[in-house]
Swiss-Prot record:
Alphabetized GO MF terms: ADP binding; ATP binding; phosphotransferase activity, phosphate group as acceptor; protein serine/threonine kinase activity
Key word Nucleotide-binding present: yes
Name of the protein in its database record: Putative pyruvate, phosphate dikinase regulatory protein
EC category name: transferase
The entry's keywords: Kinase, Nucleotide-binding, Serine/threonine-protein kinase, Transferase
Organism lineage string: Bacteria, Bacillati, Bacillota, Bacilli, Lactobacillales
């Protein structure tokens, strides 16, 4: 009995530490996201979750964002905001919640300003040309945020692609990545004993992507999530029998729909996105 406990403790120690990188921007947030990604790849033993909040252009949107991210543990906030009034609440929140925070733009802007003796324009998104491609991306990002987690079933009928998957199969970050490439994406979490919206059965099956993973991988991720919240890792959420049942149920639905299935285990979201774009014969402009 003692040996089993020791083995369990050792397993928990080797599980990946969860880090939630929050990207807040008054524009599309590509600069902040790319910098965060470049830094995060230096930590392969961490489970890094990217949570993007683009187009936060007023105090009301920012307040809602800060309220939402309060639920996540181990926060690293990366922000790109030109309006100082929107920077201050982020800094205050980070300090109150003992979160690390990084201002991507201000130090560079200040350095250029001091060198040139010029004042910055303060124009949001000035580095983007106002092209159809740019506006399509903005529209797609807004669409992905609006129809994340099955918030409104009507989004399934308007989407270019619909992602289905059990909890922790990278639906949201994948949606945002595809949106950044111009695709309108909606996603639906497959929760046990929950009704599937009728709209799912009305969609062209070629537009539906069923996400699955390996049971052991999902077990590890879910256990670590419980540990990061200070909870018992051995719950129904992380139980292998429950996980197998969830994955089997999801696969049965995918078979019924006749949709394209991707196993995301040990696969980066960039690789998964490439497979989806290839399946859709979609070429980024």
């Amino acid at each position: 009995m003692t040996e089993n406990k020791a083995e369990n403790k050792q397993t928990e120690k080797t599980e990946k530490m969860e880090v939630n990188i929050i990207i807040i921007s008054d524009s599309a947030g590509e600069t902040a996201f790319n910098n965060a990604q470049a830094a995060a790849v230096q930590f392969p033993d961490a489970e890094v979750n990217y949570r993007r909040y683009p187009f936060i252009v007023n105090e009301k949107k920012l307040a809602a964002t800060l309220e939402e991210i309060e639920q996540y543990p181990n926060l690293v906030i990366v922000y790109s905001m030109l309006d100082e009034k929107l920077q201050l609440p982020i800094i205050k929140f980070a300090r109150e919640h003992k979160a690390r925070y990084i201002d991507i733009l201000s130090p560079i802007i200040e350095a250029i300003s001091q060198t040139t003796h010029m004042k910055p324009t303060g124009l949001v998104g000035a580095n983007h040309q106002l092209t159809n491609k740019y506006f399509n991306r903005i529209s797609a990002m807004e669409f992905a945020v609006m129809y994340d987690d099955g918030k409104d079933p009507r989004g399934f009928l308007e989407a270019d692609v619909v992602l289905l998957g059990v909890s922790r199969t990278s639906k949201t970050p994948l949606s945002l990545l595809l949106a950044n490439k111009g695709l309108k994406v909606a996603n639906l979490p497959l929760v046990p004993q929950t009704h599937i919206p009728k709209e799912i059965y009305q969609i062209d099956p070629t537009k539906i992507i069923g996400l699955t993973t390996d049971p052991q991988v999902l077990n590890r991720i879910r256990r670590q999530r419980m540990i990061s919240y200070g909870m018992d890792p051995d719950t129904a959420y992380s139980n292998m029998d429950s996980i197998n049942a969830e994955l089997d149920s999801a696969m049965a639905l995918y078979k019924k729909l006749g949709c394209f299935v991707i196993n995301v285990a040990e696969r980066s979201i960039e690789e998964t996105a490439a497979l989806i774009m290839n399946h859709l014969s979609y070429e980024e402009d």
